[in-house]
Amino acid sequence: MAFNIHNRNLLSLEHHTNRELRYLLDLTRDLKAK
């Protein structure tokens, strides 16, 4: 499931849910593995 992270500040983690943060971590892991 994708999340809309457009125009969101990733420097401030307080505005993100745990689910969104997990998605971003999984996405970076997958991109790094390519």
Curated annotation (Swiss-Prot):
Full protein name: Ornithine carbamoyltransferase, catabolic
GO biological process, one term: arginine catabolic process to ornithine
Entry GO terms, CC: cytoplasm
Gene name, Swiss-Prot/TrEMBL: arcB
Catalyses which reaction(s): carbamoyl phosphate + L-ornithine = L-citrulline + phosphate + H(+)
Principal subcellular localisation of the protein: cytoplasm
Known partners and oligomeric status: Probably nonameric or dodecameric.
EC number: 2.1.3.3
Family recorded in the similarity comment: Belongs to the aspartate/ornithine carbamoyltransferase superfamily. OTCase family.
GO molecular function terms noted in the UniProt entry: ornithine carbamoyltransferase activity
